[in-house]
Amino acid sequence: MIESGIWSRMSEMIRSSGHSHHCSPQEYRFLPPVGDDDLPGDLQSLSWLTAVDVPRLQQMANGRIDLGSSGVTHPHPGALAGTADLHVGAAPRPLLRRSQTAVVPRGVLGLSPIGNHRASAEQMNQFPAGGQASSGLQEMPQLYSPATQIPFPLPLGSQQCPPAGLYGSPFSARPSYPQAHGAMHASQEPHPKHYPKPIYSYSCLIAMALKNSKTGSLPVSEIYSFMKEHFPYFKTAPDGWKNSVRHNLSLNKCFEKVETKSSGSSRKGCLWALNLARIDKMEEEMHKWKRKDLAAIHRSMANPEELDKLISDRPESCRRPGKRGEPKAPMLTHATTVAMAHSCLAISQLPPKPLMTLSLQSVPLHHQLQPQAHLAPDSPAPAQTPPLHALPSLSPGPLPQPAMGRVPGDFLNINSDMNTEVDALDPSIMDFALQGNLWEEMKEDSFSLDTLEAFGDSPLGCDLGAPSLTPVSGNSDQSFPDVQVTGLYAAYSTAADGVAPSAANSAQYLGTPGNKPIALL
């Protein structure tokens, strides 16, 4: 009676599960082909009953144990590895292959394994046991492994092998080590570029930092930052380079300390700036190293294209001192212009008028003047540095006659006072010297002294001397034909009280043996 009741219940459960469950096309690939011969017969059913714990199965049927309700999901796909082609719940899931050695947890089905006949178990595994039965049973009871052994339940969250190895499903979990390995390579930076130590001295690097600051002064910490930013070598260099920077700031005269108002005695508020008197020297030093090895400097820089900017740029507070003194340059030029104007040089900025006159006078050479001359006749003539003196009157009129009485004492000191003006004269004026042989050639070419009067309106006017004076050589009545002009020899002065000039300057006559006399006018 008991066996017939159990058999009727099992047959009804198998038929209901067969009608209610519809396999998807994907599930048909995993199901083995089922033929008419595989359907259970009476003998197979009886043999299966002998391997089942009948009291336990009856208790499950009476208690309406719901193992496959849709609200309860299985803890893990690997937990049902011991079942063969068994569906849990109403929703279709991929079928599981039967494993001979798998052990199902006790808490899942609540059954203890009992050894059964392998042939009958394989026959029963051909049917899907999922789906909801009309009698209330949701799933077919667990089929057991053929060997009788003590169960070892697995934890709910564990699995025997990765699901991807069982199903090959695209949504299954995959090992995470390839992604972690790739992430490690992605996060790892490439090998940093090696920057050599710059060939610039520490003083040049400090000067670059100060020159490229907004105010021209920086604290020590910002100087460090500038060097590390533009020369990456200092990012990984030992800390000794910071001591070298501080020593250069303290000992090098190119840098000076700037005390801020808010700093007081605190060292943190101390700023460093360039010494404006030595800023040009520092720039020259930078350009020298740039010309020496430009490639090495570029290799040591983070941005080599900024080198020219770092060397040449200056803030407003680091402008050259010469730019502040530029108004002095026109004053110097004006003073030089005045000196040259007093030395018979026509300046284009001045109005075109005669500045002074060059007078070639026939002054007699008396024997009584020779004792009064301060230079002996046999002394050589100072042809290289002739005495010059500026004329107070710039009119081209006839010049006063030189007096024979005395020679002023300051006349001999003119040479030392006017050396600078002589050096500043235009060389074309100094080439005006006419040597004796040239004078003779001009005389032979019918060049008379009367033609010199044509220069009267020019800045260099020439007035021929008075007829009352005796010629230079011998007792001849003619005007001196032999004149050697070696420079501008004229010195005149007028009385301060406006009286007609008297005893201004006496002419000096220098004679050299074997050469023609030189007239100093």
From Swiss-Prot:
PROSITE patterns: FORK_HEAD_2 (PS00658), FORK_HEAD_3 (PS50039). GO terms for molecular function: chromatin binding; cis-regulatory region sequence-specific DNA binding; DNA-binding transcription factor activity, RNA polymerase II-specific. Residues 197-293 bind DNA. Gene3D superfamilies: Winged helix-like DNA-binding domain superfamily/Winged helix DNA-binding domain. Residues 371-406 are annotated as: Disordered. One of its GO terms (cellular component) is nucleus. Disruption phenotype: Animals display early postnatal lethality, while survivors exhibit noticeable body size reduction starting at P8. At P8 and P20, retinas are reduced in thickness with the inner nuclear layer, inner plexiform layer and ganglion cell layer much thinner than in wild type and lack horizontal cells as well as amacrine cells. In lungs, mutants show dilated alveoli with thin walls. One of its GO terms (biological process) is regulation of DNA-templated transcription. Keywords: Developmental protein, DNA-binding, Neurogenesis, Nucleus, Transcription, Transcription regulation. This is Forkhead box protein N4. It comes from Mus musculus.
